[in-house]
Curated annotation (Swiss-Prot):
It catalyses: tRNA(Lys) + L-lysine + ATP = L-lysyl-tRNA(Lys) + AMP + diphosphate. This is Lysine--tRNA ligase. It comes from Helicobacter pylori (strain HPAG1). Mg(2+) 2 binds at E409. PROSITE patterns: AA_TRNA_LIGASE_II. Mg(2+) 1 binds at E402, E409. Binds 3 Mg(2+) ions per subunit. Its EC number is 6.1.1.6. Belongs to the class-II aminoacyl-tRNA synthetase family. Its cofactor is Mg(2+). One of its GO terms (cellular component) is cytosol. It comes from the Bacteria.
Length: 501
């Protein structure tokens, strides 16, 4: 693992520090303020007639980003999370310690510098070192910069390197944290209660997806990593909670691309005595709040597309297929004509697809990518909405919507099905689809049906993909850019263990 000659040289320097009686991995030394606080607190020094203040003494810490040796002195750029600060170290103050520093210090090492503020001849506020300590010796040299396709792969595999070398990456994840905390605050202000539900399920439910399977040794049963928290959250509505939300991970054992990761973050929320129309209005308020909190304009650029949040629209599923997808009503209203049309367009259609799934194929290919401004698509086919309430006027459609922005689904919501007998029949239909080979069809969940039988009030529920939301609001082109440690194809190391190296 550490056979590289440059690594060996650094290991030798770490051992040399030990021989001098110094621990290359010290603990207990503390800074007095951050680099950013130092730069703010001592900005006045640059305006002094003699630009230094020897009466003040501070300790700063960070990683060495640049090292410039000049005989009996050196300049060091030290970076902590807040800022980069220059340190000046000279032999006059440190004597033998300076010789040790020149011998052992390298870019990448983590250090503590104690000294007073002063400004250089070029006017750069710096710390004049009176003490210098190596807190952590870096034995693997840092890359100067990332470039090229292979290095993009390395950035995702070794995110710690990405964070060290590319300062902008930290900004993305700080903004992600702000987005998540803002979403949480919004729902708390709206009167929702945050809850936690199981991550391991006896039956995978709440979405049409292929689950990950694990085994519970103590119970001697298989368990499924959750694909959605929906059915547990609705059990809470049955139990008497009227507005709940959960922000957590879901796991789906499916493909990966620029907008899909098998482990992803979602918020799901359920609101008793409300409808899916209420959720549409709530979603509009949420985006208004996020744009304001993040100081973003109503028009943002994402992947060279202008998204205007002032141009939000609502359109039915069939109207979208006709007016946006360009498919005539004559074709849309007949299953055999729709199938023939899809085949004529060169779309590979799996055998035995239901009419609703044929409509979904058409929507995915001809409509979704054209929905740039926020668009709420409503009145979904009931066949692809097994948990949604059936529309009172038309039993073939569901009281459901999906929100699309910049050509991608961002949210899915509906008025919840609370008729236990109807839900039982829907589950039976899903089981029949699974027996025909549909691996993503839902399982029968009798316990959930039994819960519904105890009475669930009229309820609306919605899910929003946090990762895609962050992509949209940060301009990230890949979901891997907004997940700290995204799923990657395995690479084996010398010990045949999966590695990021």
């Amino acid at each position: 693992m550490f056979s590289n000659q440059y690594i060996q040289q650094r290991i030798h320097k770490a051992n040399s520090l030990r021989e001098e009686g110094k621990n290359p991995y010290q603990n207990g030394l503390k800074r007095s303020l951050t680099n950013a606080a130092f730069l703010e607190k001592y900005a006045y020094v640059k305006d002094l007639e003699e630009p230094k203040d020897k009466e003040k003494c501070e300790s700063i810490v960070g990683r060495v980003k640049l090292l410039r040796l000049m005989g009996k002195a050196c300049f060091i750029k030290v970076e902590d999370e807040s800022a980069i600060l220059q340190a000046y170290v000279s032999q006059n103050e440190l004597n033998d310690e300076f010789k040790s520093l020149k011998k052992h210090l390298e870019v990448g090492d983590i250090v503590l510098v104690k000294g007073f503020p002063f400004a250089t001849k070029t006017g750069e506020l710096s710390v004049h070192a009176l003490e210098f300590h190596i807190l952590s010796k870096t034995i693997v040299p840092l890359p100067e910069k990332f470039h090229g396709l292979s290095d993009i792969e390395l950035r995702y595999r070794q995110r710690y390197l990405d964070l060290i070398v590319n300062p902008g990456v930290k900004d993305v994840f700080k903004k992600r944290s702000l987005i998540v905390s803002s979403v949480r605050k919004f729902f708390e202000m709206e009167g929702f209660l945050e809850v936690e539900t199981p991550m391991m399920h006896p039956i995978p439910g709440g979405a049409n997806a292929r689950p990950f399977i694990t085994y519970h040794n103590a119970l001697e049963v298989e368990r499924y990593l959750r694909i959605a928290p929906e059915l547990y959250l609705k059990r809470l509505i049955v139990g008497g909670f009227e507005a709940v939300f959960e922000i957590n991970r879901n796991f789906r054992n499916e493909g990966m691309d620029h907008s899909h990761n098998p482990e992803f973050t979602m918020i799901e929320f359920y609101w008793a005595y409300h409808t899916y129309e209420d959720l549409i209005e709530l979603s509009k308020r949420l985006f208004d709040y996020l744009l304001k909190t993040l100081n973003l304009p109503s028009k943002i650029i994402y992947n060279d597309m202008e998204v205007d949040f002032n141009q939000t629209s609502v359109i039915s599923y069939l109207d979208a297929l006709e007016t946006i997808g360009g498919i005539s009503k004559d074709i849309l209203e007949k299953e055999d004509r729709l199938l023939a049309y899809l085949l004529e367009q060169g779309i590979k259609v799996e055998p035995n697809l239901t009419y609703g799934k044929l409509l979904a194929e058409a929507f995915d290919h001809f409509v979704e990518h054209q929905l740039i401004n926020p668009t709420f698509v409503t009145q979904y086919p009931i066949e692809i909405s097994p948990l949604a309430r059936r529309n009172d006027s038309n039993p073939n459609i569901a009281d459901r919507f999906e929100l699309f922005i910049a050509g991608k689904e961002i949210a899915n919501g509906f008025s919840e099905l609370n008729d236990p007998l109807d839900q039982l029949e829907r589950f039976k239909n899903q089981v029949a689809e699974k027996e025909k080979g549909d691996e993503e069809a839902q399982y029968m969940d009798e316990d959930y049906v039994w819960a519904l039988a105890h009475g669930m009030p009229p309820t609306a529920g919605q899910g929003i993909g946090i990762d895609r939301l962050v992509m949209l609001l940060t301009g990230a082109k890949s979901i891997k850019d907004v997940i700290l440690f995204p799923a990657m194809r395995p690479v084996k190391n010398d010990f045949n263990i999966e590695s990021g190296e």
